[in-house]
Every structure is written in structure tokens, then in C-alpha cells.
Amino acid sequence: HSDGTLTSELSRLRDRARLQRLLQGLL
């Protein structure tokens, strides 16, 4: 049952890291 929440957390962290990387590229 916790697998779904764990995968969602990982995807969220992945998206956040991607956004931070894009922001750093712009700066």
C-alpha cells in the first residue's frame, strides 16, 4: 500500500530536482 505513496514521493523529488536544475541554468 505504501508503494504508491513512495513512488509519488520519488516522482515529486525528481520533478523538484529538475526544476532546480532548470532555474540554475537560467541564472
UniProtKB/Swiss-Prot annotation:
InterPro entries: Glucagon_GIP_secretin_VIP, Prosecretin. One of its GO terms (molecular function) is hormone activity. Keywords: Amidation, Hormone, Secreted. The modification Leucine amide is found at L27. One of its GO terms (biological process) is adenylate cyclase-activating G protein-coupled receptor signaling pathway. It is found in: Secreted. GO terms for cellular component: extracellular space. It holds the Pfam family Hormone_2. The keyword Secreted applies. Hormone involved in different processes, such as regulation of the pH of the duodenal content, food intake and water homeostasis. Exerts its biological effects by binding to secretin receptor (SCTR), a G-protein coupled receptor expressed in the basolateral domain of several cells. Acts as a key gastrointestinal hormone by regulating the pH of the duodenal content. Belongs to the glucagon family. This is Secretin. The lineage of its organism: Eukaryota, Metazoa, Chordata, Craniata, Vertebrata.
